[in-house]
UniProtKB/Swiss-Prot annotation:
SMART domains: EFG_C, EFG_IV. One of its GO terms (molecular function) is GTPase activity. It comes from Rickettsia bellii (strain OSU 85-389). Belongs to the TRAFAC class translation factor GTPase superfamily. Classic translation factor GTPase family. EF-G/EF-2 subfamily. It holds the Pfam family EFG_III. Catalyzes the GTP-dependent ribosomal translocation step during translation elongation. During this step, the ribosome changes from the pre-translocational (PRE) to the post-translocational (POST) state as the newly formed A-site-bound peptidyl-tRNA and P-site-bound deacylated tRNA move to the P and E sites, respectively. Catalyzes the coordinated movement of the two tRNA molecules, the mRNA and conformational changes in the ribosome. GO terms for biological process: ribosome disassembly. This is Elongation factor G.
């Protein structure tokens, strides 16, 4: 494996469903010599889409990680899913990438899911460039897409290519850095292309865009700016250097175009990945906590530092068993060595180490900073854990995982299925942190929870195919939550005397809504529950305090209104008392649970429901009906905008009202309208609706 860090690119390819992400990745693998035959998504043969459900549905569910080479550089590509139910996969990949290519559909432009993925990439400060795909399709409009990148994403596009010809006459691109045309030969599957003079009818436009490009890049370097302003020629080398600098600092985002399906534009895209996206060295450091001191700091990304790596994905491979994908941030690791999982504080022995190509694998003996490899047979490591050198323990930044918004009951069909189902669900939950399972206390049913109907459908499908479990499925239910709306204080004493050792614990706790908490720490802003101890003078000994937190964490899973998990509140332990003999961690855990049960009703608790951001694209003539229907679903229409000859309606609608919406929309618009939705936030349920929900529980 190439050991020079500057020769590695860890990139993700992310976009909206159907923008042509997997096809683009397929072409990259083909031209870099990793696959001998181009896999077509709509034939169900794409190399990256290797789970059966993916090949059938033509969508990518799990980000396959694969390695290829271009211009002596090692490119590790993570292909991410574009369907909104799988945003967790995207979030995980972005965390371990150094750069990304955002693929846009040249016809549809910036779609809702593209926005979601873009915001996620902003969160992790991932430098990226844009590839406007499908330039050969009817209605493709490169310039409109560039405007949408500006308007919808609030990003600064740097156009470095222009399309030559439109729709079926799309022939190639104008390279604004070299100021030449790149034209592909159709008969060579796009493997052959040549640089030519820019066509006459494009010269004026190319000059105009070249001037814009120079205006934007010279701002990054005073010397080159002086040279440019005094009328001297800026060299190709200098332009490339500045584009790289601006891309890495996110001053702008280079925009390229092509048609991956028609094999045009992929090689210049690869050149741009190598020229402009960062290597691990450009990122320089990774945030983490030093275990010995508890101090948060930036650790250098370097081969000479002690070993550290982040596990970002777990996959079950039919031949190797469980595979844990890791991104190595520092140092190196060889098979046979032992490292420590610092989150679980457990040792892990490194057995087989594999370099993955979609679902083929190559054994390697060592991996070092910058590499992405899969480890076989780790016992205790789950997604988001850190593996580190035993002598210098670090915990790298954890990933935030969203709360599931939809749930269904599953019942195994037979006794044999029942035994297999437990194993299947625990394996699937280990792979996917946005998928949870629980047992309903009252009915004893197994409940599975996820990010959307498609997400759960695929989980059930995998249970059937991979684990041979047959199950009956209930109707989807909304994952409601509860919260409090005002602060309350509770002083509770737990006492139990019954022969032998007694139990004693007193706790005084303030519960308050998170929105009322002043000076929230940065790392607490995305949490749904915060616990803090303000005990002074040992009123509750240090070793008992984790018992209080554990008790609250367990009990908040069943709230006080209708038994839904309680979120968005802070619990502060302010006082308490203990007994030398009768107190224990367990006694404090019980006291905390009872304090919760007694205190929460005083906090004016309310029921919350998931609100989805819905976007409907409909022809003008159905607009009134669509809006009327959204209003009848307790929707709040936020606005409309024309897109081509259709209207885009944006609204916030409770998830509870969106089940079966696809059929209603189809009949309202004679099948011509389409919609997409993403979870946006939790909001209070109106009183009369809340009463109905409580009555059902």
């Amino acid at each position: 494996m190439s050991k020079k860090l500057e020769n590695i690119r860890n990139i993700g390819i992310c976009a909206h469903i159907d923008a042509g992400k997997t096809t683009t990745t397929e072409r990259i693998l083909y031209y870099t010599g990793k696959s001998h035959k181009i896999g077509e998504v709509h034939e169900g043969g794409a190399t990256m889409d290797w789970m059966e459900q993916e090949q059938e549905r033509g969508i990518t569910i799990t980000s396959a990680a694969t390695t290829c080479r271009w211009q002596d550089k090692q490119i590790n590509i993570i292909d991410t899913p574009g369907h909104v139910d799988f945003t967790i996969e995207v979030e995980r990949s972005l965390r371990v990438l150094d750069g990304a290519v955002a693929v846009f559909d040249g016809v549809a432009g910036v779609e809702p899911q593209s926005e979601t993925v873009w915001r996620q990439a902003d969160k992790y400060n991932v430098p990226r460039m844009c590839f406007v795909n499908k330039m050969d399709r009817m209605g493709a409009d490169f310039y409109r897409c560039v405007d949408m990148i500006k308007d919808r994403l609030g990003a600064k596009p740097l156009v470095i290519q222009l399309p030559i010809g439109i729709e079926e006459n799309f022939k190639g691109v104008v390279d604004l850095v070299k100021m030449q045309a790149v034209v592909w030969k159709d008969e060579s599957l796009g493997a052959e292309y040549s640089y030519q003079e820019i066509p006459d009818d494009m010269k004026a436009k190319a000059e105009e865009y070249r001037a814009n490009l120079l205006d934007m890049v010279v701002e990054l370097d005073d010397k080159i700016m002086e040279k440019y302003l005094s009328g001297e020629e800026v060299t190709e080398e200098e332009i490339k250097k500045l584009i790289r600098k601006g891309t890495i600092s996110a001053a702008f985002y280079p925009v390229l175009c092509g048609s991956a399906f028609k094999n045009k534009g992929v090689q210049p895209l690869l050149d741009a990945v190598v020229d402009y996206l960062p290597s691990p060295i450009d990122i320089a450091t990774v945030k983490g906590v030093e275990v010995s001191t508890g101090e948060e700091k930036d650790f250098p990304i370097s081969v000479s530092e002690p070993f550290s790596a982040l596990a970002f994905k777990i996959m079950n491979d039919p031949f190797v068993g469980s595979l844990t994908f890791i991104r190595v941030y520092s140092g190196k690791i060889t098979s046979g060595t032992t490292v420590i999982n610092t989150v679980k504080n457990k040792r892990e022995k490194i057995g087989r180490m594999l370099l993955m190509h979609a679902n083929n694998r190559e054994d390697v003996k060592e991996a070092s900073a910058g590499d992405i490899v899969a480890l076989a047979g780790l016992k205790d490591t789950t997604t988001g854990d850190t593996l580190s050198d035993e002598d210098k323990k670090v915990i790298l930044e954890r990933m935030e995982f969203p709360e599931p918004v939809i749930e269904l009951a599953v019942e195994p069909k037979s006794k044999v299925d029942q035994e297999k189902m437990g194993l299947a669900l625990s394996r699937l939950a280990a792979e996917d942190p946005s998928f949870r399972t629980s047992t309903d206390q009252e009915t004893g049913q197994t409940v599975i929870k996820g990010m959307g109907e498609l997400h759960l459908e695929i989980i059930i499908d995998r249970m059937r195919r991979e684990f041979k479990v047959e199950a009956n499925i209930g109707a989807p239910q909304v994952a409601y939550r509860e919260t409090i709306t005002k602060a309350c204080e509770i002083d509770y004493t737990h006492k139990k005397q019954s022969g032998g050792a007694g139990q004693f614990a007193r706790v005084k706790i303030i519960f308050e809504p998170l929105k009322d908490v002043k000076d929230l720490k940065e790392e607490d802003k995305n949490k749904s529950f915060i616990f803090e101890s303000k005990i002074v003078g040992g009123a509750v000994p240090k070793e008992y305090i984790p018992g209080v937190e554990k008790g609250l964490n367990n009990i908040r899973e069943t709230g006080v209104i209708a038994g839904y998990p309680m979120i968005d509140f802070k619990a502060t332990l302010i006082d308490g008392a203990f007994h030398d003999v009768d107190s224990s961690v367990l006694a404090f855990e019980i006291a905390a649970k009872a304090a919760f049960r007694e205190g929460m009703p005083k906090g004016n608790p309310k029921l919350l429901e998931p609100i989805m951001k819905v976007e409907v694209i409909t022809p003008d003539e159905y607009m009134g009906d669509v809006i009327g229907d959204l209003n009848s679903r307790r929707g709040q229409v936020q606005g409309m905008e024309p897109r081509g000859n259709a209207q885009v309606i944006k609204a916030y609608v409770p998830l509870a009202e969106m089940f079966g919406y696809v059929n209603t929309l189809r009949s309202l618009s004679q099948g011509r309208a389409q919609y997409s939705m993403v979870f946006n936030h939790y909001d209070q349920v109106p009183t009369q609706v809340a009463d109905t929900i409580k009555a059902k529980k």
